[in-house]
Amino acid sequence: ADMYAGTRAETVLGKALKGVRRESYELLTKAYWPTGPGKNDRGLSRKHIMESCNASLKRLKTDYVDLYQAHRFDVETPLEETLGAFDDLIRSGKVLYIGFSEWNAKQIAAALKIQDEKGYYRFISSQPQYSMLWRVIESEVVPLCSNEGISQIVWSPIAQGVLTGKYLPGQKAPAGSRATDKKGGADMISSFMKEPILNAVQKLIPIANKVDLTLAQLAIAWVLQNPNLSSAIIGATKPAQIKENIKAAGVKLDKSIMDEIDLVIGGLVERDPAKNASPNPRA
């Protein structure tokens, strides 16, 4: 996204991809959160979308992005304005496809209605939080998107790191972990840092061992069992973490394992469709 690391994430990625054949990879980014101090340096107004996209292309050193996403829903901008701007970006060739992140079913349905009425290009992807512990999309967002041909690209399949098992009940969080980093996600992980959840997570480790997986691999594999998902986003601070996590790709979990997981954590799972992992300060 444009705002990660104060826009530096896109700059670093652009440099890393220099010399790599553009057709060999897919590039995704997002817009919404503040990228500067100005009133128009945020949100989904036509002005910010156009300026943000142009700035992202410059930082990424490319002529287009494959998927451009609304990082959140903007309650202060008319939806027609936002969708019109996205449509113009596609028609200009700067964007190939559009999507959204953390929108609820009502917002998605409203957008699709406008896109169909106006003849705009439709959304093709949803990027919500989803994990064993966070299933708020299952009751409303997934059925709607499935019916409308919108796939899920989920984030935080290991619940901000809680589903690695490194956070132990009754003990302080490891130094340097997300739970101790107030600028790097301590608030977001707080909903999972409860004793009943941490105790249950430890009980998942023997289940992972049964299928020769680490707990993180089991968590990612669990997410990928959902047929409505196209992919899962994994984060890492070390190369070894990436090597471990990608081993979950292609793993098939049988029903007995899936049932065993639900037996351990079923009562602790968040399913409320009204919940959002990152509260919208503009809502």
Features from the language model and the residues they span:
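Glycine/proline-rich, positively charged
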Residues: 36-140
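N-terminal binding-site loop/beta-alpha segment at the start of enzyme catalytic domains
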Residues: 1-24, 63, 91
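A cross-domain feature marking catalytic cores of carbohydrate-active enzymes
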Residues: 1-2, 29-31, 72, 100-102, ...
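Generic structural signal for well-ordered alpha-helices
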Residues: 10, 14, 53-57, 83-87, ...
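Aromatic-lined glycan-binding groove of carbohydrate-active enzymes
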Residues: 137-178, 214
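Glycine-rich beta-alpha junction loops
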Residues: 31, 104, 130-134, 156-163, ...
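Conserved, mostly hydrophobic/aromatic
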Residues: 1, 13, 27, 56, ...
